Each structure stands twice: as C-alpha cells, then as structure tokens.
C-alpha cells in the first residue's frame, strides 16, 4: 500500500513538472515569435504546449500554469528592459543599486502576468466540442489580453498580435477589430491545432496554415501600390547616447540642432522626445534658427512632457503627454507603490488634458504623441477622431541597447497605421526613425544609431475606420461569445473540460 501511494505521489509530481515545463515552453515559443526574435510564424503553435499543460488540471493549477506561461513570455520578450534597469537608469540618476533593477524587472513580469491567472481559471469551464471550445478559449484569452492594457498599470506590449506585424495581408482586419481580432485569430488556430493533434488528425494543420498564408498573400496583392505623399518633413535622429544625453548642456544640443539643419531651408523639422531637457522658450538663438526652418520640438515645460511648434520666432505648445509612463513619469497608486519612487526619471509630470490636433504652416491637420503612447491604440484613435490626418510619435529610445527593443516599439506604428488608415511617422533619438503607410507597410527608415536628418514625404488621409469609430468593440463581442459558448454547451448537456477533476 505504501509503495502504491509513493508511486502515485511520484507520478503526480512528475506530471506537475512536465506541465510546468510545457507552460515555460509556451512562453519561450511565444517570445521567439515577437518582433526582433526568431519568426512570427511560431505564434500559430506557441500556445499548444500550454493547452497540453492545463489539460485535465484543476482550476488553480490551470491558473498557475497560465501565469507561468505569460510570466516567461514577458521576461524573455522584454529582456532588453533588464540592462536599462540595472545599468542605464542607475548610471544616469543614481537613485538605487543595480541589483534592485533585477527585482523591479521580475516584479514587472509578475504584474503583466497576473491577468492570465484569470485565463487559466476560466479555461476550466471550456466546452468539450471543438467549435465551442475554440470560440470559448479564444474569447477568454482576448478578454484578459484587453484587461491587461487597462488602468494605471495597463500596458499592451507583448500582445501576441505583434508577431504578425509583417503579415501585411492578415493585419488589415485591425482596421475593423483592432489588434484584439488578431489575438482571437491566433488563439483560435492554436486551440484548433491542439485539438487536431489530440485527436490524431495533425495532418489537417497543413491545409489550414496553407490557407492562412494564401489569404495573407492574396490580400497583399490587392492593396494599392504605395504612393509618395505631398507633405514633406525633416526628421532628426541625433543619436545621442543615454550616457551623454543627461549630461550634455542645452547649449551643446542647440549647436547640434543647428549643424543638423544647416542644409535645410523652409522645412518642417521634427525632433525626438525631450531633445532639450529643460524649458528653452527663452533661447534667442533657437528663435533665430526658426527664421530658417519651422521646428516641432520636444522638451519639458510647466511640469509636463511637451511638444512645441517654433515658427517665425514664436513658440506654441501643441501637445503634452497624456499617457504618462508608470513609475518613471508618474507614481501610480502612491499608497501601494510609494516604495518604488526611486524609479522616477527627470520628474513626475502632470498629464496633458487633451489630444490636440494642430497645423504647421500650410500642413494638413496633424498630431504628435510621445514615446510609449504609441503602444496604446486609444491615443491614436483620439487624435484621428479629433481630425488628425497623419500620426507622428517622437521618442527617446536611446535607453535600450538591443535592436529587438527598438523594433518592438517601432512596429506599434504598423498597427496604429492600419487601425486608423493614417500614415505613421516615428522620430527617435537613436532609431528607429521611419514611416509606415496606412496599410502597415514600412515605406522608409533611417539606419539605426546613426546621426542623420531624413526627409519623409507623407500622405494625409481623412475619414474614420470602423475601429476608430467604435474602438475595442471586439472585447465586448468576446465576452458575449464566451458566455454563449458555455450556455450552448450546457443546453446540449455537455460537461465542461474540467468536470470530475479535483480543484
């Protein structure tokens, strides 16, 4: 009897270790599908190990395994944040030791993964029929992916839809559904492929994948040929390393601005975020430069992270950042997270009050968002609803050493462009500075980590897409589909996947 009990206990431990390994494997494969890693095609299969891991498990084990999956995905996908937290920020601001950056990095992974406890928990109630199960699990995953981006700590980075940024045909659906539609599609195919394998019909995977890529290719060939726009701007990529940026004086940056624009006359010149680190509205030299060119220039002022237009010697503030970055630009929930105030950047800022659209000379109505605001689709939506005919983001990505970090940020513009059918220009300190057209095609980009001033010709567009008009309606559809799937399953007398399994 004791031997039998020992055997059963060993079997449970072994199965638990296998399930844990499969969850980690899912996170690893999902990370490898992200921009700058191995291949976006991995996303069609990356959730299959997780689905095997949770099969036959109780609700709490499912919740834990789902958490482990997304925690692994975040730590690998955002590995480039670690040297920023352990090297760059302590070096520049000197507020904490490097080892504490590791703690913060792990806590970031925990915060991002917490919503997926809910996915694992609710996966217990999945119907057994293949169609209802696919609809249910895809809907539940989509629900928690949306919730992860909501609130003071909300962030959309690492969304599995990012793996498809180069699948130009498939991503056209985001003009209707937003990226949540892609999330739903990805999870649906993973569940479908898992069921094929479980039922020993794995060969059916190949025609489905063939159809997906045939559809992608067909849509690409139907898209209009890229056109050169009539609105010309000059984007500056000053390539000032973080190790120098916070020690260089405004006078030196002014000299750099002058040298980079000396060959341009009568142009609209756009600088990255915080080109100057102090309010320079009283600089006579800068005003003199504006007699030659018009500047869209970023610097902090009035306790806000702002963008100004300098035209004919006159400054006007055109936008202040609304979505401030947690812990660096604002302290969310101070009573809870007050201990993390050491992560503060230059200052805690006041958020801007509106998503303002403006003109520069004879330009079409345009808008400028700042840094990681491009991760949030509601920002671009708000600008377009306010009349913006093209989208610009200015950023300082010099904090990050790795190309994967720069690409991850840049591809957010691919999705924002398709969602809104607006051309999207990113202007970055070290790169990537480039232009994406309204169909998500990367039209032009400057070389990374090279000091350059590049001319970009942008095409303005009017009108509102379905997504701009109705926003994240797909979230509500996912809620309805999840409820209806369970309801139909109960009406048919089906048992859910977890019935008979211990909690």
Swiss-Prot record:
SUPFAM superfamilies: Carbon-nitrogen hydrolase. The chain crosses the membrane at residues 13-32, 34-54, 63-83, 102-122, 124-144, 173-193, 203-223, 468-488. One of its GO terms (biological process) is lipoprotein biosynthetic process. One of its GO terms (cellular component) is plasma membrane. InterPro entries: Apolipo_AcylTrfase (IPR004563), C-N_Hydrolase (IPR003010), C-N_Hydrolase_sf (IPR036526), LNT_N (IPR045378). Pfam families: CN_hydrolase, LNT_N. The keyword Membrane applies. Keywords: Acyltransferase, Cell inner membrane, Cell membrane, Membrane, Transferase, Transmembrane, Transmembrane helix. It is found in: Cell inner membrane. Belongs to the CN hydrolase family. Apolipoprotein N-acyltransferase subfamily. HAMAP family: Lnt. PANTHER family: APOLIPOPROTEIN N-ACYLTRANSFERASE (PTHR38686:SF1). Catalyzes the phospholipid dependent N-acylation of the N-terminal cysteine of apolipoprotein, the last step in lipoprotein maturation. This is Apolipoprotein N-acyltransferase.
